[in-house]
């Protein structure tokens, strides 16, 4: 698991969302959310939207800051 995957899964779980909930919010499939949390990086527009949704920086999601 990558740092991005770990942080995305952590944020989703601590906010109480299922993968399906997040997929609906982001306008993507549940499979996309699963992939982000396991082996695939989100595309830049999705990364930015995820950061805004969770109110964290993209640097945090990328593992550049704590």
Protein language model features and the residues they cover:
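Conserved hydrophobic/aromatic packing and binding residues within compact polymer-binding modules
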Residues: 8, 22-23, 33-36, 61
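Short, charged recognition helix plus adjacent turn
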Residues: 14, 31, 62-66
């Amino acid at each position: 698991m990558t740092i991005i995957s770990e942080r995305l899964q952590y944020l989703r779980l601590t906010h109480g969302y299922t993968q399906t909930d997040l997929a609906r919010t982001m306008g993507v499939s549940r499979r996309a959310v699963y992939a982000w949390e396991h082996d695939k990086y989100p595309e830049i527009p999705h990364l930015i939207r995820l950061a805004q949704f969770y109110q964290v920086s993209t640097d945090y999601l990328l593992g550049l800051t704590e």
